[in-house]
Amino acid sequence: GDLFEGQWMTDYRTVSSGYEELLLKPAYRVSASASYRDLSRGLFSHLMIMHHGSESPYKTRRELEDSGLIRLYNDRERSRMRSTMVSGRVNLAIGAIHGGGSLATVYSHTESEAVAEEVAVRYGTDLLTIKGMLNSNITSRLFLLYEMSYNGNRLSLPMADRKPSRLYGMTHALEATYTPVDPLTMTLRGEYYRSRITSDLTKQMVMLDLDLTWSVSRRIDLEAGLHNLLNNDRWDYTTYGLLSRQTVSRQLRGRSLLLTLRLK
């Protein structure tokens, strides 16, 4: 039966200790990794796979009551968690463009259980992160740098009659540094943001920055930075539910000019 015929509460504010400290949770973890490198080609790579799981002899549910957080425990049902993670990274020197690139990714899949409306529900989450970089010294006066990042998540409820939800956010950035004459360096950076906030709402934005540096001497630099050239001053969106509406609005720094005297 239950530990108590009601609520087990040990800390009025956070329930920082309690029933789970009295029990042992069976758990396991298995991992494997491999690396490869070829110095002559400038190739470095690494791959790791890890799988772990645990089992608890009870199910928990959290509820807010007044100013406290209360956990409810039921040891008649067991809960299980399984997770698999794969991560990899590749770095490569590319002589044809006088530069190199890198690609790193992490993927994880987790299956667990939660209590919703007094019913134990199984759910799965997939998380995918990708980061890439490519740089090139096209000439002695022009340097290009491209960076990208992607973060995606997927939530699935096998027991529910609904499609898995997929949300993501990605960023592409291109930076060009040009030195027309030796004392002057110009850097133009463009960024493209795209986010899928809900299944039917996608938000995107472009940002541009320009930086100029004049080397007066070995110890003195004059810098001028013109940021947010397109003057995008807000990142906002509104989502709608059956009986509700939620608006998110974030203030961004508008177009600005920053002058700097740097002493080395």
What residue spans do the PLM features occupy?
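Exposed, low-structure sequence patches enriched in small/polar residues
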Residues: 1-264
